[in-house]
Amino acid sequence: MKSLRAKFLSLGMALVLALSASGCAITTPAVVGSIGGVEIPAGIYLLAQYNAYSSAASAADLATGETADDVKAVLNAQCTGTIGDEEVTTDGADYVARLTLRSLQHYAAVETLFDELGGTLSDAATSEAADQAESVWSSSGDLYAANGIGKDSLEAYLLNAAKATELLQLFYGENGQTPVTDEEYIDYLENECLYLDMVQLPLFDSSTYAFADEEQSQTIESLAEECAATLNEWATAEQGRSERFTSLYEAAMEYVPRAGEALGATMESAQALNYAGTQLMTPDDLVTYGDALTDAVAENGRNVWFTYNMGTAIGVLCAVDPLDAADLDSYKQSDLLTTMKQDELDQTLYEEGAALEQNLDESAMQVYKAANIKRTV
């Protein structure tokens, strides 16, 4: 009698021969279905899932010794975070699935609306996507390949992102469906943003990586108060932005080296110019300061220099009218439209994607389940 092992070997060989004879082959699905009229290639699905896993790993409550590379641990861990407008607490596997679906719906909505609105990508945008894919592949290609993601999928994903950028113009640009008006730009600049002139007196010695101690901090705070008083005095004689810049840089060359000296560092006057400048702070910038910075500006008003602790420096700041600092056309030519409308566009895309007919293949997605993710190669 044949051994049990021999019987299994014979059975396995018979199966291989049967498959060969019938011309059958075991393959993985090239697509995982569609959303709306947009086919979802396996590579796009796997890339969306891998990105979703990275987010889940950051949100996971892992046990001591477990890391983001422990795929099984992350998928079983409790994850808490925000998905869309919803605060979610669920296991890692469900968290990954939800984020993956949301990403694919966004992808499909971009493709759908871009075609409906007659969008086209410039040669420069197409080339940039190809170059970015090549760059990412050269550094992380082995890891992507181990996860079933090809360079062509990376490029397709980046082209989709380029289309999303173009949709911003197709929706809200000068010739878009609902163009942003000059009045809307002005209202946003005046009421949602801050334009700050600033000199920063460092509380951190970049050569030694040492922060100021209490005594040094007090010295630098006193220097900042003196700098603000000096700039307020000079402001009475200023006749415009060019004079303001002269005052700004003269103050930096005077007070920044003195702050460096208080830290025990030597700083040339020319280096001090790196600590002076101007910035339009959008809501995304201001959120990092909470209400403290906007409250300080409200208390002091515009065109008055005041001091503000920025963490790594004492800022000597002055809020000015954004339209005194630059004309409206300059802001339009910058990335202001993105800061104004990107969140609104993304919300529209997520809603449009969720409203499309969902025809994803559960069996295909099971082939590419998150448990197969590899974090190292």
Report the location of each language-model feature.
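N-terminal targeting/tethering segments
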Residues: 26-149
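Cross-family detector of peptidyl-prolyl cis-trans isomerase
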Residues: 26-27, 36-42, 245, 249-255, ...
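C-terminal motif of bacterial Sec signal peptides marking the signal peptidase cleavage site
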Residues: 19-23
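Bacterial N-terminal signal peptides that target proteins for export
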Residues: 2-11
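Charge-rich, solvent-exposed alpha-helical interaction surfaces
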Residues: 70, 74, 99, 223-226, ...
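Peptidyl-prolyl cis-trans isomerase
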Residues: 226-288
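Alpha-helical transmembrane segments of polytopic integral membrane proteins
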Residues: 18, 107-111, 164
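PPIase-associated folding chaperone regions across multiple families
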Residues: 26-28, 144-225, 280-377
